[in-house]
């Protein structure tokens, strides 16, 4: 009998590919929120009339009184009309929330208890817009579409990672993103002592201090309380701040510690390091409140009183030991055992107590220094984390300024969204080598003898900048970014076919470093010029940036800069040797 010949499958059409992409993205969104403990209501394709318009919600996720009305899109073009429509729809839902609830109960009678658990005035409803691709919104766009909270790709990938690692315990991260406090979630609390955490102080003599304005106090705290009140300043999260220095949590490390806890049932003896919130209090054995300066006697049996507020205790070291106690949401043997240990095990915690007048940036510097000291001889810290710590400790260090310039370039202009500024980013351009081997020399405030940098040409207040004035630092970063946009704007104009070609070498690290080094070296000849000057320079230069013909390999940055200086800037060879 002849074998039947299998018919070759034809490749999926563009429409089929788009359909699969949409389904995959929706599945990821659903898994992320349900993985964090939210309940999914399948509102997709359910049209309803709310207020004065017809609305359709892609997905609804509920935890207690927190409702997340989610809109997603895989569109790359024409996205502004979609955002406007969804912004108006969320506004209509908020204005007519009782009608929205009634309609949902009608559509989903099996979920009526969940949908009617809270009065409408207690429900906190958020309109989340989750795009697969960054829509590149301006500040004006964010203001105009104020009914929506945008979960951009980096933020979504961050939440997806955290939920995958610590399951339901990642919910507090989402609440922090939404700027929610504990008293806004669930039923209204009475505000009694049940909302306080009492922790016995172990070493009151230890608060001799790191600086005059920082004290240190050690105490015992249950894993559950710590898990429910802590947060971590991870550099890959959604916050637009330079004061973030912690690395991403590691799933393998969490798993290893969790298995140890399940097997041994013991806490780790090395202490957790945290920064405590400002509203802590101290109480002696007679329950009288005392100041921190009065608790220097071990015999007084003092207690530390903390408000039971999520995201209030900043973890400096020990995030894996804390989060290994996560709530999985799965009724497994391991979860039942860990649930017992969360309440039973008390971890040794050393907390920094800052004077209330210590600014956020100074607190971050102290915290990052401690993190650096602790981890310098432990697990190898990624270079991006070390750069971030250096940036916090010394914001005017050349690499610190260079990193700030990279982030500024990534926010607007020709490089917007192209830079990989986070380990979760899908940006086309990796930046660590650009900062380290090229950009730092262009922006340094202390160029080597005989060398030049943009600092020389900047007309801002140099003395203030050198004294680490934050406003002047931002002004200098803005200046450097604008110069680079003009320079590379001319490059893009004259080499557009290579700029738009993902396979070309124009936007490779080798090429970009060569261009930046060339710009730095030519300062001694031309100084700082404008777009028209650079446009003229590159209009008369022709170079093949195709991946097949590009002749330079890794680390040949200076050699490529010679090509640019000699053949684009027309700088003689004998001059090249001196700059």
Regions found by a protein language model. Give the residues of each.
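Terminal low-complexity regulatory extensions
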Residues: 22, 38, 94-95
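Short Pro/Gly-enriched beta-strand edge/turn motifs at strand-loop
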Residues: 35-45
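Accessory terminal alpha-helical modules
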Residues: 3-6, 10, 47, 51-57, ...
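Interdomain/boundary linker segments immediately adjacent to catalytic/signaling cores
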Residues: 1-28
